[in-house]
Design a protein with these regions (language model features):
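Short beta-strand/loop motif that positions the catalytic acidic residue
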Residues: 187-189, 194-196, 200
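Primarily recognizes the serine-hydrolase "nucleophile elbow" in alpha/beta-hydrolase
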Residues: 116-123, 128-173, 184-187
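C-terminal catalytic histidine-bearing segment of alpha/beta-hydrolase fold enzymes
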Residues: 209-213, 217-251
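An N-terminal hydrophobic leader/cap segment in hydrolases
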Residues: 2-42, 51
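Short alpha-helix in the alpha/beta-hydrolase fold that links the catalytic acid
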Residues: 78, 190, 204-213
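Alpha/beta-hydrolase
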Residues: 65, 94, 157-158, 224
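Acidic catalytic loop of the alpha/beta-hydrolase fold
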Residues: 198-203, 229-231
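Membrane-embedded segments
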Residues: 47-119, 123, 129, 141
């Protein structure tokens, strides 16, 4: 029995460090800090790279919280499509990503999302009732945490997971799971939109279904038949933007 307990402890510790490696792979930096970018400073003095895509006609501003293999340079390739669809967007590179200093952890991602939210409210003057956290993949974790603790118009989760460990296994075998969205969904009070492709090979479709079922506030879903994890908007086509508009206009 002692041997089994010791083996479990070793496996749990190994799972913890493996999860950190898998959660935060940090892609190569693909941009330079030019005039389109600026810095936010965390309470402990860490500089985070950020970018704001304005839209004077926008009624909704997305706080875009990206996946674990994205940074601002990559976002610059497709965020303009959100602006063209009528939205303003703010994004920030998590600590350790892009030109942001520091180290990514679950707690730090929550803090980074909060800092970006505060910038929207206090520096850009965007009222809470016009802010929608848009959490893609890993970004679903800080998006849900933010919406749980701050007033927002609604929340959009795309390619989101029930929890980080459950991306690899349906059964929570080890303690210390991270970004446990599934436990937080019933406590959200804002409107929720869940977007997921049925052929998502990175975060399986059942995650999106579970999150949607767990939400108790007003909710809508866009489950795309055959849809992948990345590039879902392009795969879906005009229907994606129509459903996004229908949700945001209801807020």
């Amino acid at each position: 029995m002692i041997l089994v307990a010791a083996l479990y402890a070793v496996l749990a510790i190994g799972a913890h460090f493996l999860s950190l490696h898998l959660l935060f792979p940090r892609p190569p930096v693909s941009y330079e800090m030019g005039p389109d970018y600026f810095q936010l400073t965390t309470p402990d003095g860490v500089k985070l790279a950020a970018r704001y895509w304005p839209n004077p006609e926008a009624k909704i501003t997305f706080l875009y919280l990206q996946g674990n293999y994205e940074e601002l340079g990559k976002l610059g390739e497709y965020i303009p499509t959100f602006v063209a669809a009528g939205y303003a967007v703010l994004a920030v590179d998590y600590r350790g990503y892009g030109h942001s200093g520091g180290t990514p952890t679950e707690a730090n991602l929550y803090a980074d999302a909060q800092l970006a939210y505060d910038h929207l409210r206090t520096k850009l003057g965007v009222p809470a009732e016009r802010i929608v956290p848009f959490g893609y993949s890993l970004g679903s974790g800080p998006a849900v945490e933010l919406a749980l603790n701050q007033p927002v118009a609604g929340i959009i989760l795309q390619g989101a997971f029930a929890s980080a460990y459950r991306v690899e296994t349906r059964i929570p075998l080890f303690p210390g799971d991270k970004f446990v969205n599934i436990r937080k969904m019933p406590r959200l009070r804002c409107p929720v939109m869940v977007i997921h492709g049925t052929e998502d090979r990175t975060v399986p479709f059942w995650h999106g279904k579970k999150l949607f079922l767990a939400a108790t506030s007003r909710k809508t879903s866009l489950f795309v038949g055959g849809g992948p994890h990345g590039g879902l908007a392009d795969y879906t086509g005009p229907h994606y933007w129509a459903e996004l508009k229908r949700f945001t206009e209801s807020l």
